[in-house]
């Protein structure tokens, strides 16, 4: 059996990410052998300029997608997708969720200092954020975290790949925020 062809067919047909274990079960190999085949396929797709597709890994799952270079051709045949606008407020809220997840709206609002209802709703609508469950606390508030779409959009395989701020950068941001607050209060 051509296992690589079977993996390609699975990923193409599913159209979304498929966990390693599910692929292994489908082709009746163990996960180690399946991962080796997937890694080989990823290298083959990336190294070939004659293939318009890539296979990407997203937090232990795999997905087939088009190479970014193919966008100009795809846009000619497909309707232009609705452009998402990530405002400063949305980016700030998304950053808090990405780094603090799982996080409640109350925790987000405590960090931001303002209501985040609209921002969180918009991020859920854009499929960058999802409900992860409820906190075991009074009122059982919803917990939010990032989605696979977030990982795809920001070009990372897992949350662990997000940049980590050094203590110096954190201090610089704090100073900038304090200066900004002073300017706003003086007006």
UniProtKB/Swiss-Prot annotation:
Principal subcellular localisation of the protein: cytoplasm
General function of this protein: Participates in chromosomal partition during cell division. May act via the formation of a condensin-like complex containing Smc and ScpA that pull DNA away from mid-cell into both cell halves.
Name of the featured protein: Segregation and condensation protein B
Alphabetical keyword list: Cell cycle, Cell division, Chromosome partition, Cytoplasm
Localization annotation: Cytoplasm
Organism: Agathobacter rectalis (strain ATCC 33656 / DSM 3377 / JCM 17463 / KCTC 5835 / VPI 0990) (Eubacterium rectale)
Pfam families: SMC_ScpB
PANTHER family reported in the protein's UniProt record: SEGREGATION AND CONDENSATION PROTEIN B
Subunit-structure text: Homodimer. Homodimerization may be required to stabilize the binding of ScpA to the Smc head domains. Component of a cohesin-like complex composed of ScpA, ScpB and the Smc homodimer, in which ScpA and ScpB bind to the head domain of Smc. The presence of the three proteins is required for the association of the complex with DNA.
Entry keyword annotation includes rRNA-binding: no
Annotated GO biological process: cell division; chromosome separation; DNA replication
HAMAP family linked: ScpB
Family classification: Belongs to the ScpB family.
GO cellular component annotations of the record: cytoplasm
């Amino acid at each position: 059996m051509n296992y690589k062809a079977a993996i390609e067919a699975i990923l193409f047909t599913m159209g979304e990410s498929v966990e390693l274990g599910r692929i292994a079960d489908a082709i009746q190999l163990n996960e180690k052998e399946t991962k080796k085949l997937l890694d080989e396929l990823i290298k083959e797709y990336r190294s070939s300029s004659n293939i318009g597709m890539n296979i990407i890994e997203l937090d232990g799952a795999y997905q087939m997608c088009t190479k970014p270079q193919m966008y100009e051709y795809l846009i000619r045949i497909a309707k232009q997708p609705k452009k998402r606008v990530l405002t400063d407020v949305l980016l700030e809220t998304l950053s808090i969720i990405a780094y603090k997840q799982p996080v409640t709206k109350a925790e987000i609002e405590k960090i931001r200092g303002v209501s985040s209802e609209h921002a969180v709703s918009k991020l859920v609508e854009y499929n960058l954020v999802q409900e992860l469950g409820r906190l075991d606390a009074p009122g059982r508030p919803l917990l939010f975290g990032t989605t696979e779409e977030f990982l795809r959009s920001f070009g990372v395989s897992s949350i662990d790949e997000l940049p980590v701020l050094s203590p110096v950068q954190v201090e610089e941001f704090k100073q900038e925020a304090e200066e900004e607050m002073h300017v706003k209060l003086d007006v």
